[in-house]
Structures are given as structure tokens and as C-alpha cells.
């Protein structure tokens, strides 16, 4: 089923911060953040076992437990199984993400993309989320940022296991859609080229943003649109770099990135618009994009995101960005006049 037929709106909720991403978030604050999203009208919630070793799913399950299940959509991910066994969180190999979830639960996280592990992962997620079904399952992180030069072997394991299992679950009506949830474009290119596998869309984090969109624009968006699929854009603020944060790609931003942010912000300031509005509205301007899911760890962030989505951005801003070479000339822009 096409993602745009499943997703209830352009703005969703990315739950990674609820897994104590970068900081130890008090339980009450985490639950209040989900409640703020619900009160704002957000009805699409994305999660993953990997986020805090199940913590984000547990918190979301608690926060949504009293909400009518037919009124919202959940996506979660497969590829990691969370065990009862406790491990040293500091010793986890998280690839480029380093110690992103060092404040999460200490349960052992096992990377496993087999068919059996996929089914177990979904079953475990349902328990943590306190629900009897999910709408969308993403195969998580089969890419270079986690597996380096071994990523193609991991992808092959997922092809034989997770892809097969999710194809069957969708055909049986257990889930409505599946695809990849990744931070790199290449795995999506590879899956689109495979015979016999029919993903419904993709969650692409950090690769269709104002700061980084060239490869996705050229290699993924046209194929996705042509096939009637859809993209959910995660990380629209590029790990916070676009809105003044110190990080890009989960690491300190390089001078080149900081310079690009400063140049975009100078233009935004001249036009009196927020960087959040620029980021969200750029991502959504591409017709292949079904939704954006900025993460939030504080209730106030929800209202900021909604305001950014509704903010009027003058066409002159987008034209100036293009003239300055700060966006790809082929990128669709929300120019109204």
C-alpha cells in the first residue's frame, strides 16, 4: 500500500530521543512530549527497538495506551533484537553513531536480520508498544554507517531473511507496508534494483535535507515517485546542525557544514523566517516525500515544528538559496508565486 494512503498527515513524530538519545530524559518529560504531539494532532509515530534498547518503544506504548488505536499509525523497525541479558553499554559497537544511546537501557542488543529474528522483533515490539499491530515495518540500518565495508553482506542477509518475512506479513495483512529505514541512499538504490521484492517506501534520515540532498534527489526520488512509493524524511534538521546545533551526522559539524548553515541562516534572517521552517518545507516540497518526522525530547518542540510547517516562507527566500548555489538546481522548491 502506498505510504501516502497510510500516513495521516505530513508531520509525524520521530521517537529516537525518547530512547535517551544523548541525554537522560526524565520519564515524565518523555511522556509529556508524546502527549504534546497527540494534542497537536500528530497521528504518525515512528520508533525502533534500537532506540535506547527498547526504551523509546516502552515509553511510547505507555503514552499512547489510552488513545484509540484506530486513530494513529505506528512504524517500527527490525534488524535488532533486544535481549533480557544485560551488557556494558559503553562497549556497544554502534558504528558512526558512537555513544548516541549510552543513557538507554542496558539490555543486550543483537543485530539479526534473519526471518526468525524479524518475526521475533515485531512480536517483542508489539509488547513494548502495548498494541496488537503495527502499520509499517522498516528494516533498520543495513548501511555503511553501521556496518562499514561489511554492509553489503548484511544487506544480503536481510534480503534472504527480513525482506522475505515482511513481504509475507504484508501479503497476509499483518502489516500494511514495509521498506528500509536507513541513513544512507545506497541501500535504497540497491533494493529498488532487486527483482522480486516490493517495498512500499523508505524512511531516509538525514539525506533529503537542506544540507544534504544531492544523491537522494538524483538517485532515489525519481524512482520512488515513478513507482508510486513514498519517502518518510527523518532527521530533517541534520542532527540539529541546521537549527544551530553543534552536531552533523552524530558528530561535531565540520567547518564546511557550519559555513553552509551560516550562509543559509543569513538568507533566512533577511527574509524573516526560521531555519526550522526552511528545513521542513524544503523536504516536503519533493512530491516523493510522504511525511517528515523530526525528533522531539521536550514538549515545546512539538509546537515549534507545527509552527515551522505553517510558517509562510516567501518565494524570494528559495530563489536566493538557488542563486547562491545552496540547493541543487533540480530540487523542487515550494515557490508559490
Regions found by a protein language model. Name each.
Residues 1-5, 57-73, 118-133, 217-230:
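Short amphipathic alpha-helices and their capping/turn segments at secondary-structure boundaries
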Residues 1-92:
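N-terminal binding-site loop/beta-alpha segment at the start of enzyme catalytic domains
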Residues 16-28, 103-119, 150-154:
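Active-site mouth loops of central-metabolism enzymes
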Residues 24-37, 114-128, 184-192:
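Short, acidic/polar
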Residues 29, 142-337:
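Beta/alpha (TIM)-barrel catalytic core signal, keyed to glycine-rich beta->alpha loops juxtaposed to Asp/Glu
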Residues 87-135:
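Active-site gating/metal-coordination segments in enzymes
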Residues 126-150:
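Active-site groove signature of glycoside hydrolases
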Amino acid at each position: 500500500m502506498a505510504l501516502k494512503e497510510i500516513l495521516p498527515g505530513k508531520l509525524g513524530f520521530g521517537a529516537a530521543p525518547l530512547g535517551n538519545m544523548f541525554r537522560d530524559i526524565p520519564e515524565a518529560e518523555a511522556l509529556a512530549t508524546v502527549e504534546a504531539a497527540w494534542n497537536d494532532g500528530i497521528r504518525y509515530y515512528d520508533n525502533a527497538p534500537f532506540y535506547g534498547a527498547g526504551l523509546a518503544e516502552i515509553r511510547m506504548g505507555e503514552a499512547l495506551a489510552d488513545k484509540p488505536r484506530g486513530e494513529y499509525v505506528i512504524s517500527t523497525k527490525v534488524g535488532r533484537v533486544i535481549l533480557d541479558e544485560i551488557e556494558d553499554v559503553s562497549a556497544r559497537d554502534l558504528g558512526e553513531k558512537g555513544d548516541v544511546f549510552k543513557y538507554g537501557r542496558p539490555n543486550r542488543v543483537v543485530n539479526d536480520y534473519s526471518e526468525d529474528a524479524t518475526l521475533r522483533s515485531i512480536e517483542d515490539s508489539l509488547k513494548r508498544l502495548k498494541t496488537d499491530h503495527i502499520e509499517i515495518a522498516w528494516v533498520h540500518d543495513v548501511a555503511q554507517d553501521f556496518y562499514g565495508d561489511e554492509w553489503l553482506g548484511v544487506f544480503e542477509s536481510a534480503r534472504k531473511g527480513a525482506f522475505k518475512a515482511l513481504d509475507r506479513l504484508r501479503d497476509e495483512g499483518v502489516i500494511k507496508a514495509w521498506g528500509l529505514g536507513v541513513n544512507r541512499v545506497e541501500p535504497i538504490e540497491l533494493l529498488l534494483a532487486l527483482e522480486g521484492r516490493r517495498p512500499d517506501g523508505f524512511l531516509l534520515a538525514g539525506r533529503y535535507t537542506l544540507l544534504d540532498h544531492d544523491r537522494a534527489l538524483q538517485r532515489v526520488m525519481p524512482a520512488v515517485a515513478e513507482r508510486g512509493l513514498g519517502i518518510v524524511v527523518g532527521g530533517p534538521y541534520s542532527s540539529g546542525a541546521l537549527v544551530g546545533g553543534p552536531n552533523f551526522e552524530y558528530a561535531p559539524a565540520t567547518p564546511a557544514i557550519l559555513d553552509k548553515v551560516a550562509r543559509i541562516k543569513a538568507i533566512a534572517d533577511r527574509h524573516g523566517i526560521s531555519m526550522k521552517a526552511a528545513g521542513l518545507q524544503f523536504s516536503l516540497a519533493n512530491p516523493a516525500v510522504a511525511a517528515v518526522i523530526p525528533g522531539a525530547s521536550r514538549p515545546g518542540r512539538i509546537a515549534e515544528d507545527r509552527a515551522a510547517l505553517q510558517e509562510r516562507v516567501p518565494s524570494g527566500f528559495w530563489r536566493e538559496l538557488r542563486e547562491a548555489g545552496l540547493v541543487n538546481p533540480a530540487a523542487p522548491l515550494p515557490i508559490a508565486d
